[in-house]
Amino acid sequence: MNATAGAELFERGRSVALRINRVRSIAPWGWKTWLRSGNGDGMKTEDLIRCMAADTRQSQSSIALLLKGLVPSLGFTMAMVWVGLGIRADIAHAMMTPVFVIRIVLAAGVGLVAARIALLLSRPGRQGVARLGPLAGIAVVALALMVWACVTTPEAARCMATVGKSFPFCLVMIPVLSFLPVAAILFALRRGATTMPVLTAFVAGLSGAGMATAVYALSCAEDSPLFYVTWYGLAILGVAALTAAAGSRLLRW
């Protein structure tokens, strides 16, 4: 390897090293020594990334930071719903009805599953689209529920059941309530070293919006799956798209 190529490889490795040093995720084989030596011939960039991916300490620190930020942000979101919107008056009765419980389970499921996938994507060397299977499964369940509701709802009532009385409010409040959870997740993911920042940020947006939607559902009185699969789904996807646009910069090395 000539001197120019060696210097270029060293600089690439050093930039990655500084990124990981900043988040206290130094790999166990001690590459500070490699940096001090100034010898870029000893390791290729691909080897460096594989070693980073094998280090479990980065994942552990990301999970801890995620919980530290997510728990208070969700608590604040819950307080906003409780004080600002109010919990629906018939909540005790609603909790006994499957259509109400299912929407909370679906939204919370999106949030929790997406959080797990986002943490995996925040580590280099992880497959991207292949890890989205669980989210696709939740989407299939939601669409099946929507088809069931369409079949069982009288034709004359389908339009009203879909539009409801509060879909504009829903489309505004879910993004507003999602802001803090999404910010907490993105902050935790910055400890990682994702090679797919847009996809990782999109999944992070799904996670934060899903959790916020589960909280918002405690206030929303629209119980038809035609309503909440449509409008909750659009609001969650909208937040995810905005997060992907922002995360392409926030999560890039």
Model-derived features: positions:
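Alpha-helical membrane-inserting segments
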Residues: 80-84, 114-118, 122, 184-188, ...
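Non-cytosolic membrane-interface motifs at loop->transmembrane helix junctions
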Residues: 94-100, 158-171, 200, 225-234
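Selected alpha-helical membrane-embedding segments in polytopic membrane proteins
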Residues: 65-162
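Hydrophobic cores of alpha-helical transmembrane segments in multi-pass inner/ER membrane proteins
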Residues: 106-116, 175-184, 236-247
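Hydrophobic alpha-helical transmembrane segments in multi-pass integral membrane proteins
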Residues: 145-153, 211-222
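N-terminal juxtamembrane cytosolic/stromal segments of multi-pass membrane proteins
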Residues: 34-67
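Membrane-proximal helix-loop-helix units in multi-pass membrane proteins
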Residues: 144-199
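Hydrophobic alpha-helical membrane segments
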Residues: 177-178, 200-216
